[in-house]
């Protein structure tokens, strides 16, 4: 079975071809037009997707050495995401499927991230034959879920305010780093001291104020953003410039320690021996190192996506479509393109 996947949920235009668990192509075009604005401008994102969609799809088919007539299924992100951006990909995919007379399958973007750590192991073949804890962490979402052997999902924790990826980007902007600031903080933090300043770690055992962390797998990062802003306002520009790497390392340590503590605690509490981390923040080197160290100490298997599959990409869309078909699951026909749409049940 040959599946074309399309991804346009935010500011990456991507098309990929997957056949029997193997990624034949995965073309990703990251939009650079948002840098000057310090964040994604929805209207610009939609127009860029519209401009690039045909060329990116042609490139994916060409790299896979197939033609559009070889396709058996077309899958596309159906949300959550920027509504205009999602609609560009959906309309293109549905029109192409209708013209080729092949099935169209809408795919939930967050759900696709959850299974992205298994793409390199062969998509449908790589998923563990046991329940696992999924930490899906990106610029828009921070979710802890239990994934069953039947691919069922139960969310046990989520952000109460801001996502971890947004905390990286916004605090990085406060430090004068370019957008997206997450990778910039990761790079800069390698030169800094994570113990330079202790920023808050809300709803955790490390919190100096919270009393309600036990058995609570929700996240909160708005307080961290406020704390960083307030602290920076008290420092001189010269001091900030001199210690920029130390500040970046301290911010990163605060975010990573919360993600690591809650994810491992959830696995231990529910007696689950596998953890999968996905989403753009899963590319963060400190998060990977912290999770590898703690999972090794606790005897928990850790699944991480390759760097190319951490950020938004169409291979994960096609791979999840193939996984669902291989398990005999009926494609979801009803979907919501809303930014915070829930996963299909």
Curated annotation (Swiss-Prot):
Q: Could you identify this protein by its name?
A: tRNA N6-adenosine threonylcarbamoyltransferase
Q: Can you tell me which residues bind Fe cation?
A: 109, 113, 312
Q: Which gene encodes it?
A: tsaD
Select a single GO molecular function from the record's annotations and give it.
iron ion binding
Quote the CDD domains the UniProt record gives: ASKHA_NBD_TsaD_bac (cd24133)
UniProt entry keywords in alphabetical sequence: Acyltransferase, Cytoplasm, Iron, Metal-binding, Transferase, tRNA processing
| GO CC annotation | cytoplasm
Its annotated function is as follows: Required for the formation of a threonylcarbamoyl group on adenosine at position 37 (t(6)A37) in tRNAs that read codons beginning with adenine. Is involved in the transfer of the threonylcarbamoyl moiety of threonylcarbamoyl-AMP (TC-AMP) to the N6 group of A37, together with TsaE and TsaB. TsaD likely plays a direct catalytic role in this reaction.
A GO BP entry is: tRNA threonylcarbamoyladenosine modification
What Enzyme Commission number(s) does the record list for this chain? 2.3.1.234
Binding residues for substrate: 136-140, 169, 182, 186, 284
What the entry lists under InterPro entries is as follows:
ATPase_NBD, Gcp-like_dom, KAE1/TsaD, TsaD
**Catalytic activity field:** L-threonylcarbamoyladenylate + adenosine(37) in tRNA = N(6)-L-threonylcarbamoyladenosine(37) in tRNA + AMP + H(+)
Task: State the signal peptide span.
Answer: none
Q: Which Pfam families match?
A: TsaD
Family under the similarity heading = Belongs to the KAE1 / TsaD family.
Location in the cell = Cytoplasm
User: Which cofactors are required for activity?
Assistant: Fe(2+)
What the record notes about the co-factor is:
Binds 1 Fe(2+) ion per subunit.
Q: What class of enzyme is it?
A: transferase
